[in-house]
Amino acid sequence: MLVTKLAPDFKAPAVLGNNEVDEHFELSKNLGKNGVILFFWPKDFTFVCPTEIIAFDKRVKDFHEKGFNVIGVSIDSEQVHFAWKNTPVEKGGIGQVSFPMVADITKSISRDYDVLFEEAIALRGAFLIDKNMKVRHAVINDLPLGRNADEMLRMVDALLHFEEHGEVCPAGWRKGDKGMKATHQGVAEYLKENSIKL
């Protein structure tokens, strides 16, 4: 489990948003002001994967506005990533997504993040990594279960709220909701006002 630990750094080839290839793309050199969303998918040119990639890409601006970059990883080569980006959506491609797509051809990144499945492909892992490279949230889905990019945005908002106000974010918390002081009195006050909504 990586939550609360430093995220494993890596250097690998990546296809950038402008379709250039960075042969030495490093996670630690590509954090946003507040951190990064690092997500894995099993394989290019498959089925659930393009829906997730397109969903994250449609929200890249939202993540950037919150100070987070988005980086994707699969075990495919940079050439396969490039081909998939240049395949139209209506033909099963992903189109010109704007975030870097890392080529984990050695599978070492997937292994380091504990998402490598049967030494073959990555499970659907997603990691919220803060500006200090600490993993603050992780979710790993089985192959048939797609992730929700909006839930990752919610987790980003929760982390930013905690960092700014020092309040913890209870179940179902959304930006604009009241946080909770992490004390016995704080939880009692919160539950008195909000337990019916939980």
From Swiss-Prot:
Residues of the active site: C49 (cysteine sulfenic acid (-soh) intermediate)
Catalytic activity: a hydroperoxide + NADH + H(+) = an alcohol + NAD(+) + H2O
Transmembrane segments: none
UniProtKB keywords: Antioxidant, Cytoplasm, Disulfide bond, Oxidoreductase, Peroxidase, Redox-active center
Gene Ontology CC: cytosol
Domain Thioredoxin: from-to ranges: 2-161
GO terms for biological process, alphabetical: cell redox homeostasis; cellular response to stress; hydrogen peroxide catabolic process; response to oxidative stress
One GO MF term: thioredoxin peroxidase activity
Subcellular localization: Cytoplasm
Listed EC numbers: 1.11.1.26
Root EC class: oxidoreductase
Origin: domain of life: Bacteria
Similarity field: Belongs to the peroxiredoxin family. AhpC/Prx1 subfamily.
PANTHER family: THIOREDOXIN PEROXIDASE, THIOREDOXIN-DEPENDENT PEROXIDE REDUCTASE, MITOCHONDRIAL
Other notes: The active site is a conserved redox-active cysteine residue, the peroxidatic cysteine (C(P)), which makes the nucleophilic attack on the peroxide substrate. The peroxide oxidizes the C(P)-SH to cysteine sulfenic acid (C(P)-SOH), which then reacts with another cysteine residue, the resolving cysteine (C(R)), to form a disulfide bridge. The disulfide is subsequently reduced by an appropriate electron donor to complete the catalytic cycle. In this typical 2-Cys peroxiredoxin, C(R) is provided by the other dimeric subunit to form an intersubunit disulfide.
Function: Thiol-specific peroxidase that catalyzes the reduction of hydrogen peroxide and organic hydroperoxides to water and alcohols, respectively. Plays a role in cell protection against oxidative stress by detoxifying peroxides.
Subunit comment: Homodimer; disulfide-linked, upon oxidation. 5 homodimers assemble to form a ring-like decamer.
Protein name per its UniProtKB record: Alkyl hydroperoxide reductase C
Organism encoding this protein: Helicobacter pylori (strain J99 / ATCC 700824) (Campylobacter pylori J99)
